[in-house]
Design a protein with these regions (language model features):
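N-terminal export signals
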Residues: 1-14
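N-terminal glycine-rich anion-binding loop in soluble enzyme alpha/beta folds
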Residues: 12-72, 219, 226-272
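Cap/lid and interdomain-hinge subdomains that line or gate substrate/regulatory clefts
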Residues: 63-70, 120, 127-257
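Periplasmic-binding protein-like
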Residues: 91-100, 119-120, 299-305
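Short, acidic/small-residue loops that bind anionic groups at enzyme active sites
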Residues: 100, 108-132, 140-151, 324-337
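Long, internal scaffold/assembly segments composed of regular secondary structure
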Residues: 257-346, 350
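C-terminal catalytic subdomain
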Residues: 327-442
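Extended hydrophobic packing segments that form well-structured cores
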Residues: 399-497
Length: 497
């Protein structure tokens, strides 16, 4: 167990009478290591120590009557040891800061029943934070409040709610106070007027007819349980392929053609940073390999287990630039062999006659009333192959700072529609947001489209446990056609905002 200052957590000490007036707050940072030692959000090599110091200094300054007991934990076992120490000298409550995505620290803390404040370090712990928070909300866990804000003051103000417990309030009183505070500190809706954007749509019937002729390649993984439901309900054929077939196509790619494609990317990009010409040529060869597999199998889309393939040495270039090119041309390049998201892309790209879907790992920032859609693959032709292009940059893949990936600087002022299709449940998850800008925060994925959600941002915290982290975003007001598609299929639409 490592304390926030890099020292071991302080041993339990004798309780002093003057301590009884102070709020004893255990702070647990859920993370792999003080300096990140592996590829994950936010990125390899990230130094959490200055962030931790900033959090603790802000709390100490604003809450002089608090005794802070900081520690780091990478999972349930480490957490259990810390909680065991706390039994000897009980604390009044817990602050759990999710610094990396999936470290399961908050769960054993919540089980204690003590007042617990759960906080996201945005663009770092957001995946786990959203999924775990949704689990707490679904189970109506009575002792866990949460904060998801880029504004440190919002965290500090929520921490002050622990004083309620010290004065005799219950854990439920504490949670209600944090929820009230979060709503009060979230800005009201802005101007939701959007720029005109006429979408050329197929009818639901014609869309479904075309989907029955479509094939999706799933390379190196995927969810076998969903494939049959995709075929039965949408008519899309999903063909599973091994990494070996993609790697062979990559090895056989025409080097001169790859060099020419890479030069084209260099000329088109607004900026290139930390990506060598050789790496870009490897990415172009991977694009040619993707195209070769699509042609070989007569497919219109491909989704690759890119992280497992690259980290495991099964593939030797990231597919991100190839997906960028495919999505720009009206075909489908889908991340992480996420079949659900790839099928969502196929369905709506077909219905909109070429508009690309943007798979993302979203982040919610209540300080700005925004949902930020983040990933390292994105199109720069949001209105379809014949539509306008937006600027893009070529950077490394964020988590490991290797390879080549895309930062697409997407247009502001447009209505967007975000979806996930669940054929196995006959459901469509749906929300909309107005595009209001792009975040250039260095942490986490390169493309970060900022949207102001239509509806209730509080409601947006609720569905991540059932649907996972990924969402697929399209430019355009697609509410009516999505509901019409659901009606044609006999499916239910779940509005998550």
């Amino acid at each position: 167990v490592v304390g926030a200052t890099g020292l071991s957590a302080a041993p339990a000490r004798a309780f002093r009478l003057e301590d009884s007036a102070k709020v004893r707050l255990r702070i647990l940072y859920a993370l792999h290591a003080p300096v990140q030692d592996r590829p994950d959000w936010p990125n390899i090599g990230f130094d959490f120590r200055p962030v931790i110091s900033q959090i603790e200094n802000a709390i100490r300054q604003a809450c002089p009557n608090f005794e802070l007991l900081p520690a780091m934990a990478d999972g349930p076992e480490t957490t259990a040891k810390i909680l065991q120490e706390d039994q000897a000298n009980p604390v009044d409550g817990y602050l759990v800061c999710q610094m990396n995505c999936w470290n399961r620290v908050v769960q054993p803390v919540a089980e204690l029943g003590k007042p617990t404040l759960y906080a996201d370090f945005l663009f770092a712990g957001s995946g786990g934070f959203l999924v775990y928070t949704a689990q707490f909300l679904r189970r109506n866990v009575p002792n866990v409040g949460f904060v998801s804000s880029s504004r440190l003051e919002d965290l500090v103000e929520a921490v002050k709610c622990f004083e309620i417990v010290k004065k005799g309030g219950t854990a439920a009183d504490f949670v209600a106070a944090t929820a009230k505070l979060r709503r009060e500190r979230t800005p009201g809706p802005g101007d939701m007027t959007c720029k005109p954007d006429q979408v050329q749509l197929l009818s639901p019937e014609e869309c479904l007819r075309q989907l029955r002729e479509i094939k999706l390649l799933a390379v190196g993984g995927g969810w076998p349980g969903i494939i049959e439901a995709v075929k039965n309900s949408l008519g899309i054929t999903v063909l599973s392929l091994p990494f070996q077939e993609l790697n062979e196509a990559y090895q056989q790619a025409d080097k001169d053609a790859a060099r020419e494609i890479a030069r084209g990317w260099e000329q088109a990009a607004a900026r290139i940073a930390d990506v060598s010409p050789e790496v870009l040529e490897q990415s172009a060869a991977m694009y040619l390999a993707e195209k070769a597999l699509l042609q070989k199998h007569g497919a219109q889309g491909i989704s690759i287990n890119c992280l497992g393939g690259f980290y495991g040495g099964h593939i030797h270039a990231y597919p991100c630039m190839g997906f960028f090119e495919l999505n720009n041309s009206g075909l489908i390049g889908g991340c992480e062999c996420d079949i659900r998201s790839a099928v969502t892309m196929l369905a709506l790209t077909t219905m909109t006659q070429g508009r690309p879907g943007f798979i993302s790992d979203p982040v919610i920032d209540t300080a700005k009333r925004q949902i930020i859609y983040a990933h390292c693959v994105a199109s720069n032709k949001q209105f379809g192959p014949q539509g306008a292009s937006n600027p893009f940059e070529i950077l490394t893949h964020s988590e490991d700072r290797k390879g080549a990936a895309v930062r697409s600087i997407m247009p502001e002022g447009y209505m967007t529609t975000t979806l996930e299709l669940a054929p196995e449940r006959e459901q469509i998850l749906f929300h909309q947001a107005k595009s209001v800008g792009n975040s250039f925060e260095d942490r986490a994925c390169r493309t970060k489209l900022c949207g102001e959600p239509v509806g209730d941002i509080e409601k947006l915290f609720a569905e991540w446990d059932q649907w996972g982290w990924h969402r697929v975003t399209f430019y355009g007001d697609l509410k009516e056609p999505v509901f019409a598609l659901a009606d044609a299929l006999g499916w239910t639409v779940i509005e998550e905002a």
